[in-house]
A protein has these predicted regions:
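Ser/Thr/Asn(+Pro)-rich, low-complexity disordered segments
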Residues: 1-241
Length: 241
């Protein structure tokens, strides 16, 4: 919210839909009808402002990140050097597939880009899944928040297999499951917590995935889109601890 709106109110000061309907903010008495109407008008104006800012953000141009030679999106752009980064997102099992999906839909990159994304498979427990770079829940499941999913497709089966492997690995390590990119218990010289990708061995190319063990609760929240019952149980386990 702070990214979209200057001077955003504290999260606990944002009224719920029920409170808006009653015409009162948290912890305050109901207001007269005229004030409720004025508040509703102000809320609609704020929503309109957010809509316009979202449209401006959605209009961003990504074409300069597309590498025609390999049919992939660069991981970034070096402003100082005025050139694309030579590395590219080259795996379908990546959070970057959401950008690929949207850019193809917008016509910013050709459809062949989708088929240039790597589809190497890995197996565990009799199930096959796409292999990702770091074996994190984020890579498999973040796009599911927006992208459509269809039963028994490669992506659908891969997401389910990835969650199953995460659950299995949690049992092996005797901890709640859910490993992904996250902050962890290390700080820099400014006492800022560090952030990097963590994952599960067997799901990712990256070496040393079993060296660290960091559980990210949001990984279970992402899994609600795939295995809601198991994810709810795991979230409750995390809350109890």
């Amino acid at each position: 919210l702070e990214f979209l709106l200057r001077d955003a109110p504290p999260f606990d000061a944002i009224p719920t839909l029920a409170e808006l309907a009653a015409g009162c903010a948290p912890g305050t008495p109901a207001r007269p009808s005229a004030l409720r109407h004025a508040g509703a008008a102000a809320r609609i104006a704020l929503i309109d402002e957010l809509v316009e800012r979202c449209r401006d953000l959605a209009a961003m141009d990504f074409e300069f990140l597309y590498d025609n030679a390999c049919g992939l999106l660069s991981i970034g752009y070096d402003v100082g050097e005025r050139r694309r980064d030579p590395s590219c997102y080259d795996l379908l099992a990546s959070e970057a597939r959401l950008a690929s999906f949207l850019l193809i839909a917008q016509g910013q990159v050709p459809q062949k880009h989708w088929f240039a994304l790597g589809r190497l498979l890995t197996g565990h427990g009799g199930a096959l899944s796409l292999i990702s770079w770091s074996g994190s829940m984020f890579e498999y499941l973040m796009p599911c928040l927006i992208m459509p999913s269809y039963d028994n497709t490669l992506l659908d089966l891969s997401c389910k297999a990835a969650v199953s492997r995460q659950i299995e690995y949690g049992r092996q390590r005797v901890v709640p499951w859910g490993i992904s990119e996250s902050s962890y218990n290390a700080t820099d010289m400014h006492q800022v917590y560090q952030y990097r990708a963590f994952g599960v061995p067997g799901l990712g190319f990256k070496r040393g995935l079993g060296d660290d063990l960091v559980i990210a609760p949001y990984a279970s929240a992402l899994a609600l889109t795939v295995m809601p019952r198991e994810a709810c149980r795991n979230l409750q386990t995390l809350a109890d601890k």
